[in-house]
């Protein structure tokens, strides 16, 4: 544990940010899983769930949780998965 007052405060701030970031990352992972599940089951609302997942990914990018390229990669892989399964269906 830090002894300096400013470091104690910065540790508290970092902990808040870590919790917030992990919550946002979890939300992104969940939305991607839901979208992929809907795609594989040929669900009617798959397109909407993919759109929701893109929204969550880009929101995480704008909040600084993901780097720009990471967000683009996640979106791109989800689109590839969607297009591959829609073409075969």
Swiss-Prot record:
Coiled coil: none annotated. Belongs to the bacterial ribosomal protein bS20 family. One of its GO terms (biological process) is translation. Binds directly to 16S ribosomal RNA. This is Small ribosomal subunit protein bS20. GO terms for molecular function: small ribosomal subunit rRNA binding; structural constituent of ribosome. Keywords: Ribonucleoprotein, Ribosomal protein, RNA-binding, rRNA-binding.
